[in-house]
Curated annotation (Swiss-Prot):
Its main location: cytoplasm. GO terms for molecular function: nuclease activity. It comes from the Bacteria. This is Putative pre-16S rRNA nuclease. The lineage of its organism: Bacteria, Bacillati, Cyanobacteriota, Cyanophyceae, Synechococcales. Its EC number is 3.1.-.-. Keywords: Cytoplasm, Hydrolase, Nuclease, Ribosome biogenesis. The keyword Cytoplasm applies. GO terms for biological process: rRNA 5'-end processing. Could be a nuclease involved in processing of the 5'-end of pre-16S rRNA. It comes from Prochlorococcus marinus (strain NATL2A). It holds the Pfam family RuvX. InterPro entries: RNaseH-like_sf (IPR012337), YqgF (IPR005227), YqgF/RNaseH-like_dom (IPR006641), YqgF/RNaseH-like_dom_sf (IPR037027). Belongs to the YqgF nuclease family.
Length: 144
């Protein structure tokens, strides 16, 4: 796989209760865990993302896609894709999806976060997705 062009992106681990967030600098060198968003109405979520994107000068979104062990879509992956596409359209940002299978389990082990209800585990999972995207891609797609 070809590495994507580095830029300031947000990586999202979209769950039913929280959205974990991680961001990187424009050169793709450092990854920062950001506070998770506790889900509300889409409009309220959007306002929070608009502020984060403005403050960080975000150029694209990476969304985790929780495929099953065979790489097939699940009910949750369909919900995540719908949310990610809607968010990217509203923010006018290009978007890429990355398979997030087991990212939360990996985050729990890597960062010793168990039984977390604060959203730190979700943002840690988003950071793992972002690290994976910086290495493997795919490129951001602005046709959403």
């Amino acid at each position: 796989m070809i590495q994507p062009k580095p830029c300031s992106v947000l990586s999202l681990d979209i769950g039913d209760k929280r959205i974990g967030i991680a961001g990187c600098d424009p050169l793709g060198i450092s990854i920062t865990h950001l506070p998770a968003i506790f889900r509300d109405s889409f409009e309220k979520d959007l306002k929070e993302f608009e502020k984060i994107c403005f403050d960080r000068r975000v150029e694209g979104l990476i969304c985790g896609n929780p495929l099953d062990m065979n790489g097939m879509e699940t009910k949750q992956s369909i919900r995540c894709k719908k949310y990610g596409i809607k968010l990217a359209k509203c923010l006018k940002l290009p978007l890429a999806f990355i398979n997030e299978h087991c990212s939360t389990v990996e985050a729990k082990e890597k960062f010793s976060l168990k039984n977390d209800k604060t959203g730190r585990i979700d943002s840690a999972a988003a950071a793992i997705l972002l690290q994976q995207w910086l290495i493997e891609g795919p490129d951001l797609d602005d046709s959403n």
